[in-house]
Amino acid sequence: MKQLLCVLLLAGVLRAAEPVFPYGAVYFRKSNPPEEDWARDHATAARMGMNMFRHWFMWASIEVAPGKYDWRDYDRMMDLAAKNGIKVVIAEMVTAAPEWVFDKYPHARFHASDDSVVHSSIGGSSATGGFPGVCLDNEDVRALAERFLTALAARYRNHPATYGYDLWNENSYGGGSPQKMHCYCQATQRKFRDWLKGRYTTMDALASSWGRHSYPDWSYVHPPRNFGGYSESLDWLEFRIDDAFRLLHWRSELFRRVDPKNHIVAHGVAGTLDALPSSANDEWRSAAEVETWGFTWVASRKGSELWKQFHAVDLVRAGSRGKPFWHAEAQAGPLWMQPQVIGRPREDGRISDDKDVRLWNLISCAGGATGILYPRWRPLLDGPLFGAFGPYGMDGSVTPRSEMAAKVARWANSHTEIWKSRPVHGDIGIVFVPESELFAYVQQGATAQYAESARGAYQAFFDSNIQADWVHVDDIAQYKAVYLPYPLMLKAATAAKLSKYVENGGILISEGLPAYFSDHGKAGATQPRLGLDRLFGAKESYVEFTPDLLENLTLEVRGSKIGGRFFLQEYETAGGTAAGHFANGHIAAVENKVGNGRTLLIGSYPGASYFRHHQPEAKKFFAGLLEWAGITQLTTSNDAQVQARLHTGAGGTWLWVVNPTREPRMVTVGVGAEYRKATDVWQERSHRVDGRRVEVKVDDRNVAVIRLE
């Protein structure tokens, strides 16, 4: 192998340097593609501008017996990549455990909340066994996994094709429904008790918080088997999330120790707003562990409305906190018969064409992605996801979709300057508060109310071409104004952060019932509390938790008729000024000045209402919040169906104008400064500039990528 590597090193030297813009796909996952096509497929990929492959290095398919590794197929993949100048991301897959592990270590199988035990299964994306792995809270099997990962990194760390390692595929903890949640094995329960000791210190404190007063000692403490809005449920969810990220950190530290020179990357599913409680999806915590973050997003599963992909890209960019990120699994082929597509039109992401590939690629770039990979280079030939996602044909043949992918790949790698600039800071921030989502889950069994409130607020701004950035509550000082969706539960520490932000000059727009529930899931006897009555200059006079009756709630705020949903809260002023009313004349909104900042409290959930109803007057209201906050909008578009984004930095100023419609559009885009020249490097045309306005023609399902000078 050493002699061959010398030859391969010379052969790949011209393209062995790291790509300007990583572009490629997941290629090998043991069961696919057929071996007789490997060499041809690599040559095709290289010829068409692909510079990166990710392969699934599955523990279950490599360590065929204890300490016995079968690397043959993987060695071939690495050597073919080096020969063709393709870099490889090694996706560690200890989430597929060897069959012998399941039998030799039965205690490490996932134990669910219904007392069922998980057995080895064939994977949905690989026709191989060992899924979903075993519980790595068991130190004996984690030591086995560490032995495998160490051998993996040691074998390939000096290979010329190696780019780095992708950790914990899609950063999602499986087994997340309250009815069948993982893991309740003895090892996990012991770790949970240790976690609780760190939080409560004494048994008396735990008993008081949980309302379980007959524990003789810590060994009697067990995680809850069903959920309510109680302290024990919240503690269990927070522990599961912390435990998942403890294991991600273990992975990252292991690879850094064994191979300090290559890259550490990971990707999730942009699921922070709805899957934090169930699957530990957290863009911020994941991105903190790696050099490059990323995400899976396919329109076939999510829908092709423009705001949806943009909101995902924006979420991943926010979580990355300035680090580079990739669209690590992008769609370029159809999806057959899966439940997410049934009943939807074929044009809604179900059957992709070349223009879809172009549009979806460039939307992610407009949001700041600096790499694109597909979940398949060519489709799988078996399993429930046969024929799905890949740009190439079932036999690896070139298609119009793969030709478009090649065009984007070559273009992106020939324009180094574009990727040196980054998306500008948004007009306003939408605040992510983890406990608000967790509480929705334990109280209602789902995160829909939280997610619809957050996403509805995003849509309301987006529909006016306002760039609303997602912002973690720890980062709100970076924004002049922030919008707080669904703050039904806030911890005391969060309330203090919000108060400090406003005292220091921030502008906080909050939806209703802020901190109605706080630490340990307890409601306050008076509302608002935790000092929020002073912050908002208001006290509650009446409250209603009647979501079935409030679907079409209306209220007037600052002269606009908007909608609410789920709950309502009426107020009396306590230092603030009435800024809106319900239909009965009672106060629905209060403005206040505190320290150097201002607040606006709205007594329901207008974000969730906009998510469902899209009222034109509510759209105007959300847009008007910028003027109320004294903020000048970064970019404007006179066509509501066309979205514009601005990037600035060392690579210059770039205007991205996205047309998702099926017809060309002429749009006037307002920008924040005067320019003399607008050169479109993607559509290869010039656009008319009139000071702070650019007249842009964008072809159907296309994007203008314009250098402004």
Task: Describe the function of each predicted region.
Residues 32-47, 145-151, 275-286, 353-361:
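Short, acidic/polar
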Residues 17-38, 42-52, 428:
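An acidic-aromatic substrate-binding cleft motif
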Residues 39-46, 51-120, 149-153, 251-259, ...:
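Aromatic-lined substrate-binding rim segments of carbohydrate-active enzymes
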Residues 301-311, 315-709:
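Carbohydrate-binding surfaces of carbohydrate-active enzymes
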Residues 25, 45, 53, 81, ...:
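Conserved, mostly hydrophobic/aromatic
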Residues 23-34, 56-72, 126-146, 181, ...:
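The substrate-binding groove and active-site-proximal loops of carbohydrate-active enzymes
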Residues 113-309, 315:
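Polysaccharide-binding and catalytic clefts of secreted carbohydrate-active enzymes
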Residues 3-12:
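Sec-dependent N-terminal signal peptides
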